[in-house]
Amino acid sequence: MKTLLLTLVVVTIVCLDLGYSLICFNQETYRPETTTTCPDGEDTCYSTFWNDHRGVKIERGCGCPRVNPGISIICCKTDKCNN
């Protein structure tokens, strides 16, 4: 009985996805759509927006970085939420 219980515990641990990795878009302005799998423990995606002499620039990725004045940022917490 103990062997069966131990076997069930081991199988459960092996079969469970013990870690979840967030997927975020990571392309820049006017680039083809690409995604990246965020590092373990990273649970946020971001999009930043700013203007330069060529127009609106957009950057996307994992995390929620601090930005300088004049740069807008949106952070979110679900897969591919930063498009």
From Swiss-Prot:
**Do the record's keywords include Nucleotide-binding?**
no
State where it is primarily located.
secreted
Q: Which UniProt keywords apply?
A: Disulfide bond, Secreted, Signal, Toxin
> Per the UniProt record, which residue ranges are transmembrane?
none
Its GO CC terms are: extracellular region
Q: Which PROSITE patterns does this one have?
A: SNAKE_TOXIN (PS00272)
Name any one GO molecular function.
Answer: toxin activity
Q: In which tissues is it expressed?
A: Expressed by the venom gland.
Q: List the disulfide bonds.
A: C24-C45, C38-C62, C64-C75, C76-C81
Q: Which InterPro entries match?
A: Snake_3FTx (IPR003571), Snake_toxin-like_sf (IPR045860), Snake_toxin_con_site (IPR018354), Toxin_cobra-type (IPR054131)
Name the Pfam families for this protein: Toxin_cobra-type
**Protein's recorded name:** Weak neurotoxin WNTX33
Q: Which organism is it from?
A: Ophiophagus hannah
